[in-house]
């Protein structure tokens, strides 16, 4: 599957917000000017149309979760087919991706690193190895690190970092055993207010 291999900070500057693509707890605001677009002096921002604003929001969310365009559109169509609010459904689908759950539980410092752990068969779901990053986790599923992978330094480093981070209330994590439970899908109020999913719904509704 294709993936972005360029500078990660450049993506965050382009979207004007920290996409948490780099490991560590300190916001990258101290490393780069998020309100200034990429380039030595940045580019003067033109007044954006409604379409451009909607497109930018979609790109921001897509990059935040590390999902390609085609796959993101599939998620949207699935979200629209489900009962309830389409925008909230979309966020729940993205949040229940295995790579995101592994990241939220603190087994990987970033979503990208979490995908690597999955690809290298270091992650188990209900005691079975799963190596598909887009695997949809269901409520009460158990996520754990394989025994032979528990001594990896990057996993230990990630678990040390997560102790200083706010823990999602829809997850239950035992850092000592390197396992956790996906208790439920997150409510919209549980997630970042910086995401405006309504703009994405408006974009795809045209």
Swiss-Prot record:
InterPro entries: Ribosomal_uS4, Ribosomal_uS4_bac-type, Ribosomal_uS4_CS, Ribosomal_uS4_N, S4_RNA-bd, S4_RNA-bd_sf. Keywords: Ribonucleoprotein, Ribosomal protein, RNA-binding, rRNA-binding. GO terms for biological process: ribosomal small subunit biogenesis; translation. It holds the Pfam family S4. Residues 96-156 form the S4 RNA-binding domain. GO terms for molecular function: rRNA binding; structural constituent of ribosome. One of its GO terms (cellular component) is small ribosomal subunit. It comes from the Bacteria. PANTHER family: 30S 40S RIBOSOMAL PROTEIN, SMALL RIBOSOMAL SUBUNIT PROTEIN US4M. One of the primary rRNA binding proteins, it binds directly to 16S rRNA where it nucleates assembly of the body of the 30S subunit. With S5 and S12 plays an important role in translational accuracy. HAMAP family: Ribosomal_uS4_B. Part of the 30S ribosomal subunit. Contacts protein S5. The interaction surface between S4 and S5 is involved in control of translational fidelity. This is Small ribosomal subunit protein uS4. The lineage of its organism: Bacteria, Pseudomonadati, Pseudomonadota, Gammaproteobacteria, Enterobacterales.
